[in-house]
Amino acid sequence: MVTKTLTAPDNKTATRLLNVAETLFSEHGYAMTTVRDISAKSKVNQALINYHFKNKRGLFNAVFERRATVLLKERADLLRAAKIKAKKKPIPLKELIYAFVYPPLRMASEDKGGQSFVKLQARLHNEPKEIESALRAKLYDKVSLLFVDELKRTLPKLSESSICWRLIFIMGLYLYVASNTGRLEVISKGKAKGGNLKQALPEILNFCEQGFLSAPTQP
């Protein structure tokens, strides 16, 4: 008798499901995307979604974790490299900002899937609280807190509250820019290109650096 084993989630069928689900979730959100929608667009039987991911929430989590783990590893690696380079001194502010914003901007600029994931990140706060909170706690908190600690060393005159506020502003900024809505092209009359990483990165770094260097506003 042949025993059927569960196929690994990185096989062709599961990867196709992840790619299609990523696009649909980023465009319509968790609640408005159905298993039937994903099945129809991917041309994969609904039973195989349950086979690989158990249910819609399991698929959503897998979609999110697939790229988030890559992004966060890159972010942590850049931070680690900056710490080594600093030789126990505070890390230069612009290098901290670069380590934080470059991975998602790079990901969004390289392929359509990366851009879909950044859009998915941007709309995570609109998803059911139990899904949003669980994903943020599992995936993002550890690395984000590492950056808070390093920013406190680099900016000792800023309160932790101000540092966290300003870091949140940076998150909103890069998520909007990386989503490449086309708004930048409209208001600049085509002079600026939102999808151009070489153009966007220095603007973001300079803007965020000045934001962190502005006078403390909270005790």
List each model region and its residues.
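C-terminal peripheral helix-coil segments that are non-catalytic and often amphipathic
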Residues: V2, K138-P219
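An amphipathic alpha-helix adjacent to DNA-recognition modules
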Residues: N11-N19, F53-R80, R136
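Helix-turn-helix
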Residues: R16, L24, H28-G58, A62-R66
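Short, amphipathic alpha-helical "lid/cap" segments that border enzyme active or binding sites
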Residues: L18, K94-V101, K198-E209
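Hydrophobic alpha-helical connector segments
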Residues: D77-G114
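Amphipathic alpha-helical segments used for helix-helix packing
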Residues: K94-A99, D111-K138, T181-V186
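Short alpha-helical scaffolding segments that buttress acidic/His motifs in well-ordered protein cores
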Residues: F100-P104, V118-H125, I170, Y174, ...
